[in-house]
Amino acid sequence: IGRELAVSLGLAQDVVDTACLAHDLGHPPFGHNGERALNQWMADFGGFEGNAQTLRILTRLEPKRFDSAGRSVGLNLTRATLDASCKYPWSLQEASVGSAKFGYFIDDSPIFEWMRSGAPARRKCVEAQAMDLSDDIAYSVHDFEDAVVGEYIDPEILTSKSGHESLIRAVARWSNGTYSDDELAQAFDRIACADTWLTSWEGTRTDQARLKNFTSDMIGRFAGAAIRDTLAEAGGEPLAR
């Protein structure tokens, strides 16, 4: 997904691709529950955040290169690649009120400052934005796929009137008023009108193939919409640094 975005937007393909592969390296087992547990245990030492741990792995913990003083510089990646892998370019102390998301630990400040030299404070570079969007598209689509395969979601019920209405109400609550019921209903209808949409699931090989086709269709649709809107917003101006 990241490479498709990079190619279409004229970004450095290898930089975006590497960022997509690297950005979750610091996340622990058990997902965000594991991250919260580690954060509690490390509270007296500045806490724990998976994204900040990613930067530490790339620049210190993975021992591939060493400086003249014998200190590890990690994988010795380029400034652009490290910056593209940084989802939250700020420390815990600089994070927004109520947010526990940050991109580097205080004792990693020197490498962060080198990485972000000349960049606007708290603004992700365009390659990091492409990585972030790729991540959103990938996990959103594949979470749906996993839910269908695990039989947590029944496409037949989802498409029924009662299931449809329940879905709209649930998403409306989750979005906290960001989208109206009408907007959500229209969005669902657009997806359900896709030729690849599943109306039932019995777990057959044919169903599995149909589900794979649907997820591929959704990835292409979401990536394509982002590409079109981004190019239109840029007005022909180059996006690459």
Where are these regions (language model features)?
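Sequence-structural signature of the catalytic-core scaffold of metal-dependent phosphohydrolases
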Residues: 3, 7-8, 14, 25-208, ...
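Short glycine-rich or small-residue beta-strand-to-loop segments that form or flank ligand, phosphate
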Residues: 18-22
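Substrate-recognition/cap regions that form aromatic- and gly/pro-loop-enriched pockets
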Residues: 224-241
